[in-house]
Each structure stands twice: as C-alpha cells, then as structure tokens.
C-alpha cells in the first residue's frame, strides 16, 4: 500500500465504510473549508487582540503554539474517529499563532499577507491540476523521498528552535535573506507542494476503497497541516525577498 508524504495521511488509516457512511471528496472539501474558516476566524481575533492589548495577544499566541502542537501530536496516537474534535481544536489554536505572526509580517512588509495567501492557494490548485493530469504521478519512491525530506526539515526546525532558546547561536544562513536562506525556503516550499500530490492520492484512494466517513475529518486535518506549513514558508520567503 502506498504511503503519503504527509505523516498524518497514509493508507494505514483506511477502514471500510458502508452506504452513506463512506468517505467522499465533497465531504473532505467541506470539512477542509470549515477548518480553514475556524483558523481564519481565530487568526483575526488574535491579530485584533494583540493590536489592542499586546499582553493578552502574546498570551494567546503562546497558548496557540502549545495547543496546536498538542493537538497535532495527539492526532498520531488517538482513535482517528476523534479527528472530528481534534481537527477544529487544532485549527482554532493554529489561528491564534498565525494572527500575530501574520500581523507582524504585515507591519514590516505591507501587502505581504495577501501575497502569501494568494500564492498558497495558487500552489494548492496548481498541484491539484498537476495531480489530476498525472504530470507528477504518486509513487512509493516519491512518498519515501518526501517523508525523508520532511523528516530532515523538521530536524532542522527543531535544532534551530533549541539553539535559539538555549544559546546565542543559530543555524547559519537558512534564516537570512541571502542565496542560502532563499534557496532553503524554496526547497521547503517545493517539498510542501509535492506533499499535496500524495495527499490527493490518499484521499482519492480512500474514496475508491470505501473508507469510513469519519476519515473525512482526518483527511481535512492533514490538508490543513500542509496548507498552514506552506503559508508560513511562503510568508517567510516573501519577507526574505522584500528585505533584500
């Protein structure tokens, strides 16, 4: 069975549904839109709060970091049927993080949010067309390569975070606006975009194989993870380019 590059979406999640209890493309799309709506709403709330009350806004920001990480990690271990609860919780907490982060970027580089949102969804729909046209075909080798790349990127993120917290040092160049920093962001965005191909394949196979309907929430959660990741990386790339 093929595995998705997204650590949350893989064929091991499949069960079998019956009749109206089966997973559908429309169901996944609707639930993904709902999660995005929740995220956008809480992002607006946190962004507005931090401009009026910076202290409370900062508390919401760190609460969002802790809550979204806890929700994302718990999704690996819990019964997938609980995704109907964990998904919206994750989206709400993630919005608390994205609001202040996006607001800070917008303060430094006016118009950057609109650019980042446009590029994120533009990339999403481009990869959907690429997938439907089978220009890039999902394969076991692609899944393994993406999983390895995502693992390496996560290790770099973790090492960078630990160094920033525990020492005055950081991993050189990757956060800067030089060639290496911009190149790193482009690589991360490319990996994230290719992850969509495997995610779409997971969802399509789930529908074809009659996966249970509760996996619509799980699939929507997986897509949400990728969309948020891409948005943040595109925002960072645009900031690097505009700071040159």
Task: Label the model's feature ranges.
Residues 1-244:
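A hydrophobic alpha-helical transmembrane-helix feature that marks the membrane cores
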């Amino acid at each position: 069975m093929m595995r998705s590059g997204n650590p949350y979406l893989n064929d091991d999640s499949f069960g079998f549904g019956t009749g109206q209890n089966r997973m559908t493309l429309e169901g996944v799309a609707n639930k993904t839109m709902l999660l995005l709506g929740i995220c956008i709403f809480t992002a607006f709330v946190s962004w507005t709060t931090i401009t009026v009350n910076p202290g409370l806004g900062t508390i919401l920001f760190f609460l969002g970091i802790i809550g979204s990480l806890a929700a994302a990690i718990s999704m690996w271990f819990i019964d997938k049927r609980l995704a109907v609860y964990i998904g919206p919780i994750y989206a709400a907490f993630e919005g608390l993080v994205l609001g202040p982060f996006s607001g800070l970027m917008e303060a430094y580089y006016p118009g950057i949010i609109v650019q980042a949102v446009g590029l994120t969804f533009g990339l999403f729909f481009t990869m959907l067309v690429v997938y439907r046209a089978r220009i890039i075909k999902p394969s076991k080798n692609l899944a393994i390569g993406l999983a390895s790349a995502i693992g390496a990127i996560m290790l770099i993120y973790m090492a960078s975070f630990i160094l920033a917290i525990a020492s005055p040092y950081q991993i050189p160049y990757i956060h800067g606006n030089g060639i290496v920093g911009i190149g790193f962001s482009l690589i991360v965005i490319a990996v994230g975009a290719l992850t969509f191909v495997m995610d779409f394949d997971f969802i399509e196979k789930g529908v074809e194989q009659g996966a249970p309907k509760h996996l619509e929430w799980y699939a929507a959660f997986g897509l949400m993870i990728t969309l948020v990741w891409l948005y943040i990386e595109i925002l960072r790339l645009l900031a690097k380019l505009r700071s040159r």
